Amino acid sequence: MTTILKHLPAGQRIGIAFSGGLDTSAALLWMRQKGAVPYAYTANLGQPDEDDYDAIPRRAMEYGAENARLIDCRKQLVAEGIAAIQCGAFHNTTGGLTYFNTTPLGRAVTGTMLVAAMKEDGVNIWGDGSTYKGNDIERFYRYGLLTNAELQIYKPWLDTDFIDELGGRHEMSEFMIACGFDYKMSVEKAYSTDSNMLGATHEAKDLEFLNSSVKIVNPIMGVKFWDESVKIPAEEVTVRFEQGHPVALNGKTFSDDVEMMLEANRIGGRHGLGMSDQIENRIIEAKSRGIYEAPGMALLHIAYERLLTGIHNEDTIEQYHSHGRQLGKLLYQGRWFDSQALMLRDGLQRWVASQITGEVTLELRRGNDYSILNTVSDNLTYKAERLTMEKGESVFSPDDRIGQLTMRNLDITDTREKLFGYAKAGLLTASSATGLPQVENLENKAK
């Protein structure tokens, strides 16, 4: 069976991930006119720039959908977002600022839940708006086939017939108007935006040029913290975790995790927390640039890692970062539910996250400027009295430290001999700007 269909399968049911925007609206109407039987599926991901989800399926029916469903994906999305925080599943960082993989998390949820809904309706052909140059076409492909082994893929944007007729936004708008729908193109922004409850992605158009900065972006989850005319008073916030799960913000608990994430977004968003500018490597190994918002994810991540560093030992923290980066890359590639990702997730959640219980108090200022004011946990292995610089009882004595330092003589001697060997091999050259002349002198004295 051919998995990818290059031309419209007339007479067959086709499920389309329907956003209500111009592209998917024109595609749905065009497919119906060409003889297909389109079914529309809209994911409610808590998009901050969408205020009427119920209207989207109604529009799909007007454009010719055989049926249209709104699938509430918010609970699952937040669950996956919390799992990513617990695992540190983030691999793109620039200058200490993190991209929280919010789009890949959204695709993992959308790709599985929408295809599952299609399967219930007997729809085994799926289309969406992803282009052939991006990451999403592969993410949706993988998640779709994981959910339904019989799935076939039809994308209007890979169909030359569709492209020849409706290859641009102007043509699509004219097509909608000609068919009796007064669908005017929205005002063109200098970039495109994709969002869900966890974060927003701004990319393409002017943002493809590196001399266009964050200053051209209008945040949809936060504020323009770079604009000095925007007043942003400092704010203290306390985040509580229990066994790796965020349970309270400023002492307030929530009926469900969706409400908790919305409040975290509101708190972080008031300051522009979690906004970053990243150059990343797409799945096809070409570089792209995006500006990201994730105020709630950033707030929870900061508090989580503060507790992590106070609770776990050095090697565990190192493995958390190493495995988290691996897992973040798998998530980015659309492999969040692959066996290698599940293995990493299980270990990080079982042995690391389960011990993260406590509270962290932060002072948020502008953008990513914050201070940690207090850290409280019964699980802390950080104990001030163990290494206090003040006089008092100590867990070890000066003689103990002398013995420990003496043991270091073995590896110091080994390192010195290696440096001599490197110098003799010409790999190191003595220079007045380095300590190597002294090493040579020591070698001569040893002779």
Swiss-Prot record:
Entry EC number(s): 6.3.4.5
GO terms of biological process kind: argininosuccinate metabolic process; L-arginine biosynthetic process; urea cycle
Reactions catalysed: L-citrulline + L-aspartate + ATP = 2-(N(omega)-L-arginino)succinate + AMP + diphosphate + H(+)
Class in the EC hierarchy, top level: ligase
MF GO annotations: argininosuccinate synthase activity; ATP binding; protein homodimerization activity
InterPro entries xrefs: Arg_succ_synth_type2_subfam, Arginosuc_syn_C, Arginosuc_syn_N, Arginosuc_synth, Arginosuc_synth_CS, Arginosuc_synth_type_1_subfam, AS_cat/multimer_dom_body, AS_multimer_C_tail
Residue sites binding L-aspartate per the record: T131, N135, D136
Binding residues annotated for ATP, in chain numbering: A17, F18, S19, G20, G21, L22, D23, T24, S25, A43, G129, T131, D136, D194
Pathway info: Amino-acid biosynthesis; L-arginine biosynthesis; L-arginine from L-ornithine and carbamoyl phosphate: step 2/3
Protein residues bound to L-citrulline: Y99, N135, R139, S192, T201, E203, E280
Localization of this protein: Cytoplasm
Pfam families: Arginosuc_syn_C, Arginosuc_synth
Top-level taxon of origin: Bacteria
Keywords of this entry: Amino-acid biosynthesis, Arginine biosynthesis, ATP-binding, Cytoplasm, Ligase, Nucleotide-binding
Transmembrane annotation, as ranges: none
The keyword Lyase appears for this protein: no
Keyword ATP-binding: yes
GO (cellular component) term, any one: cytoplasm
Major localization class: cytoplasm
Protein family (similarity comment): Belongs to the argininosuccinate synthase family. Type 2 subfamily.
HAMAP family, per the entry: Arg_succ_synth_type2 (MF_00581)
Oligomeric and partner information: Homotetramer.
Protein name as annotated: Argininosuccinate synthase
Organism: Salmonella typhi
Gene name linked to the record: argG
